[in-house]
Amino acid sequence: MSSDSSVFTGENLNDYLKAVAKEYKKMGGKAMPAELILIGGAAVIANYGFREMTTDIDAIIHAASVMKDAINLVGDQYHLQNGWLNTDFMRTASYSPKLDQYSTYYRTFGGILSVRTVQAEYLIAMKLRSGRLYKNDRSDIAGILAEHEKRGEPITMDRITQAVTNLYGGWEQISASSQLFIQQIMQNGEYQKTYGVIRQEEQDNKELLISFEGKYPGATTSENVERIITDFKKKQKRNQTLNWL
């Protein structure tokens, strides 16, 4: 099986899910219909066109135990990385047991695998809860807002507040930086223009962290990563100022 080379797109996602349904049925899963709830990048590429790919598929899985074997077999067949379809996010802060309730039907594969997704304000709420400055969280929020505006179905701040409340109990569970971000982007309203700027910033932050990790291996944690990015940028800015003097 290959490592770290898998790319999932809106085009091939359905092919892989269809293959999983086929293998699950062959393994005897037809006695227990299965359900997947796609979240994160997989939910973005399933519902929207602004993002081309994701490198893994995060999901909530309701199925017989053979589902794990079916997923691994499809991974072997298509040379996908280990954990290409996983439930790891359920151990993160963005998980909520209420995601099942607020997910939306997507498609059924093989007459046995029902797939649902999280979208619109609920996906935005999850991205705000996660709030990673070096991933696609903020650019995904901008992209979702932009697409809904194009569709003539704009997402309001009231809807986002309701989603945050339904999933996490209220804004107190969302970081101050994420709250400031959503307030500013909603007030600005230029979602499409902002998307490219934010995405570039995320890529810069990722490169910054790679550089930091090279100098200080193992020093980065989920608790200090935002402070590291902020401090590193301040240091870079000071150095640039000194070079200009």
Residue ranges of predicted features:
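Compositionally biased terminal segments of proteins
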Residues: 1-245
